[in-house]
C-alpha cells in the first residue's frame, strides 16, 4: 500500500520522506528550534518532528517530585518537563515558520491532550512513538483522526506490534524498525527486522 503525505508518495521503495527529529532537543528555546528547522530545510529534509506532552499527564507520579540536575540548575523532574515543553504560543510560531520555509512539521503525541492540541494545526501525518505502542486508547484516538500514521517499533515485541497494527490498519500506515539505544552499536541494529516486517505487513511501507 502506498499513500501520500502532502505531495510526497510513501511506498517503501522508490521515494524517500526525510524527517528531521527535533524532539525536545530545542530545550524549550523557540529560537533554537527555528535554527534546527532552518538547518533541516537547508539539508533537504521533507519534514521536522517534535514531541508533544502534557507533563502532568505523561510524567509518572513516582517521578514528578524527584530532583535532577538540569542546565538551569536543580529542579524536580516535573518542573524540568514543563521547562522544555512548548505550548500554543511556540507552536503557532513554529507552524508559521515551517509554512514560510515550505517544510512539513508534526509531532509524536504522548497523551490524548497533546493529540487534541496537535490536531488543531492540521498535521499532514501523525507519529506513534515506540514507547506508546501499547497505549490502546491513544492508538484508537490516532486512528479515529483518519490521518496517515507512522509507527515506530523500538523495543516492542511482535505481539505488541501486531496488536497496534490491528488498531491502526485502516489508516494509511508506515511501520518503522527503530532502535531505542542512542547511539546504537552497529551489532545491535538488527536490520534484518526490516525484511521481517516487510514479510509480515506486505501492504504497508516499512
Regions found by a protein language model. Name each.
Residues 1-206:
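Catalytic cores and adjacent flexible loops of soluble metabolic enzymes
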Amino acid at each position: 500500500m502506498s499513500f501520500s503525505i502532502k505531495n510526497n508518495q510513501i511506498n517503501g521503495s522508490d521515494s524517500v520522506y526525510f524527517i528531521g527529529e527535533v524532539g525536545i532537543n530545542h530545550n524549550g528555546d523557540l529560537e533554537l528550534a527555528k535554527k534546527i528547522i532552518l538547518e533541516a530545510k537547508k539539508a533537504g529534509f521533507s519534514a521536522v518532528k517534535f514531541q508533544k506532552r502534557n507533563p502532568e499527564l505523561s510524567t509518572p507520579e513516582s517521578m514528578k517530585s524527584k530532583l535532577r540536575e538540569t542546565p538551569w540548575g536543580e529542579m524536580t523532574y516535573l518542573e524540568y518537563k514543563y521547562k522544555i515543553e512548548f505550548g500554543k504560543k511556540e507552536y503557532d510560531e513554529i507552524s508559521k515558520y515551517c509554512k514560510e520555509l515550505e517544510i512539513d512539521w508534526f509531532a509524536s503525541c504522548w497523551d490524548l491532550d497533546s493529540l487534541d492540541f496537535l490536531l488543531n494545526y492540521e498535521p499532514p501525518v501523525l507519529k506513534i512513538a515506540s514507547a506508546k505502542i501499547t497505549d490502546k486508547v491513544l492508538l484508537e484516538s490516532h486512528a479515529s483522526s483518519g490521518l496517515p500514521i507512522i509507527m515506530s517499533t523500538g523495543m516492542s515485541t511482535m505481539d505488541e506490534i501486531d496488536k497496534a497494527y490491528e488498531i491502526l490498519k485502516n489508516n494509511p500506515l508506515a511501520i518503522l524498525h527503530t532502535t531505542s539505544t542512542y547511539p546504537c552499536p552497529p551489532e545491535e541494529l538488527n536490520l534484518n527486522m526490516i525484511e521481517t516486517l516487510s514479510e509480515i505487513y506486505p501492504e504497508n511501507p516499512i
